[in-house]
Amino acid sequence: MLNIDIIIIIIIDILVVLILTGFVSLCERRILALVQIRIGPALCFFGILTPITDGIKLFIKFIIFVISFDIIYLIGAMIITACCIFLGWFYFPIGFILLLDTGFTLTVMLCVHVFCSMFSTFFVGCFLFSSCFVYLSAMRTMFFSIISESGIFLLYTTIYSLDYFSFFGIKDVCVGQIYITNFYIAGVLFISVFWVSMLLDGLKLPFDYMECESELVAGLITELSGFFFVLYSVLEINHILLTTLLFASLCFGGLFICFKAILILIFGFFYPRVIGYRLKITTAQAFILIFLFYMCVLMFIWLFTTKIIAMLF
């Protein structure tokens, strides 16, 4: 009976994640269309059937492309992608459903984030396509992903060093911020650095390196068609959703986490894509990102040192 309950919970989690991914994708496209005054073709019945026709065209392209592709590699990539998409949600409470309520939740989230970011770049640039230019652009993008993941790791460790009882548990950190004395994380500097690190980690504007490299070498996203495009889109949107919920829980914890996450998703991730501009990968850009990494290091050392002094004296 217990196994049936676990299977039902897993199915509910997967359905909720897929529905959230679909709604977030439609919301993002709608905001971009409204800002650019480009509503769309509105094909038949006020545009209701337009997403269906677009999906049919994508999968027709996939049927043509998959003829020369090894099916074993495709199945392996799909399994790894599914693990990246759904594993992190089992540690995050959706309503009253919490499958894995253990310590070290932030550590698991960090591992999922690192693997998801690295695999998405590898999946696109190093695995599906044999072009040397796409391979080099994927390596450049992966370099900046490593910098962002290192900064996020230090910020997670800073959160742990500021709390005495969380034990890397996201639920304890979130609930502990209900009390005004524990509302220590919502500093302007910490939120700013954490937000920029999350934008860099999700490869969103102004750090949209995947699109920049696509324009340079014509290949990181533009070669995706059909099923590969759907896989990468679901992986990217799910990564942004987990990032938003983590940002809302760690920096604005307490009550109404879902409402705060929706506001952060719109104003923190959608609108920068609307009003921002892309920063190309240059030497100056690399120095800026390394400076961001050292800012995270200094913040971690400062807060960790003050906690050690407080514990000793």
UniProtKB/Swiss-Prot annotation:
The chain crosses the membrane at residues 6-26, 31-51, 62-82, 84-104, 109-129, 142-162, 183-203, 216-235, 250-270, 286-306. InterPro entries: NADH_UbQ_OxRdtase_su1/FPO, NADH_UbQ_OxRdtase_su1_CS. PROSITE patterns: COMPLEX1_ND1_2. Keywords: Electron transport, Membrane, Mitochondrion, Mitochondrion inner membrane, NAD, Respiratory chain, Translocase, Transmembrane, Transmembrane helix, Transport, Ubiquinone. GO terms for cellular component: mitochondrial inner membrane. GO terms for biological process: aerobic respiration. Its EC number is 7.1.1.2. Disulfide bonds: none annotated. Core subunit of the mitochondrial membrane respiratory chain NADH dehydrogenase (Complex I) that is believed to belong to the minimal assembly required for catalysis. Complex I functions in the transfer of electrons from NADH to the respiratory chain. The immediate electron acceptor for the enzyme is believed to be ubiquinone. This is NADH-ubiquinone oxidoreductase chain 1. The gene is ND1.
